[in-house]
From Swiss-Prot:
Naturally occurring in which organism (per UniProt): Arabidopsis thaliana (Mouse-ear cress)
Source taxon at top rank: Eukaryota
Function: Probable transcription factor. Involved in stress responses. Plays a repressive role in cell expansion by counteracting the positive role of CPR5 in this process, but does not regulate cell proliferation or endoreduplication.
Stated family: Belongs to the GeBP family.
Region feature (Disordered): 36-57, 167-191
Keyword Nucleus found: yes
Any one GO biological process: regulation of DNA-templated transcription
Biased composition (Low complexity): 38-50
Protein name: GLABROUS1 enhancer-binding protein-like 3
Subcellular location: Nucleus
Keyword Nucleus attributed: yes
Location of region: Non-canonical leucine-zipper: 382-403
Tissue: Expressed in the apical meristem and young leaf primordia. Detected in the vascular tissues of rosette leaves, in primary and secondary roots and at the base of flowers and siliques.
Keywords: Nucleus, Transcription, Transcription regulation
Amino acid sequence: MVGTKRVADSIDTNSDDTLTRNREVEVEAMLSRRKQLRTTTTRTTTTRTTPLSLSSSASKMNWSKNDELVILGGIVDYENETKLSYRSDWDALYRYIKDCVEAKFSKIQLINKVKNMKRKFTYNQGRSNHGEQLSFTNTDDDEIFKLSLIIWDKNESEYVSNENIDQAKDVPSGEPETNDVPCEEQDDRDVPCEEQERANIEIDNGVREKLDQAKDVPCVEQESEDVPCVEQERVSIEIDNGEKEKLDQTMDCEEQENTDVLCEEKGDKDVPCEEQENKDVPCEEQERVSIEIDNGEEEMSSEEDGVDEVGVMEDTLDSGISFQGLGKNGVKDKSEEDDVVELGVLQEIFKEDTFFQSLGRYQQKLLLQNLENVGVERRKELINEWKALFVDEQRLCVKKLTFAAKLANLGVSP
């Protein structure tokens, strides 16, 4: 009995061991199959999802307001520097802007962003054209709209040109009239000849046009024949006691020389000159021209004696520039006209500066608008300072011309 029990017990233990081993093998096989399934599924999912995730992340770009301002400002500066449209070469525009933005982006993202900003601008522009008042919650949106206006508004250039034309109309043009008109005709306009000459000094773009000083240099042929140029002496520039240049004469020095020499060679004035016979012009007509010149000199001398009576033009003797226009239908209010003229002069002086010309169009427009906020007193101080600089420049030019005349005389007369 005992032997049978032991055999049965051994059989039971062997069967239990085999069962446990079979279970362990099955568990290991199951785990291995699960691992294989997981690896295959992860591989397929990664191969399928990776391009989508990359494409979606590449297409998405969170642009800030600062980035938009940098892009628009870069477009404005790029067009100013290259004189080309930004649409002509996207690669060049991308290279020009990419280093200015902190975030990394591609050329396609830049193109899409510019197109979106243009759509937004056209929408806002349409609202404003239909009479809706545009109001922005922050200053960044306002700056973005202004930059977009500079880039995409077709009428912007016309608006700026019209603004400049209006400012030029406010500034007295004062083109110098020809001196061929006698002083008697100018007296009919109730304007003295001396005052009319001073008032007709031209201010072109805020900087007074330099007078033709080359005619102040004595004519070489005239000096060789010892014939004084009457018209040249009449309109010669006086520098003593702070008096500045007057308007240049319209009669050419050489023509005056020829007419005076020809008339002096003929003792009998009734006999026509030899060269004037070819032109069918009698010598008497030449005499009338010289008489008119003498009358003009006498009237100028009499008007120079009465300069003190002209109170309005008293200050312009030192500066050589008149900032008051003579209106055709009456004179406007003096204070308002002076303010407009001074503002226009300051803006045009600033435009001629090399630093201003090196800036972009948007920065130039902002600086010109800021000049309008300058006070009246400060504006007058700047005008007076510019007058002093201009007078110094004119004196230097006169000295240079005088020195050139001396060199010319030395070269002619050994």
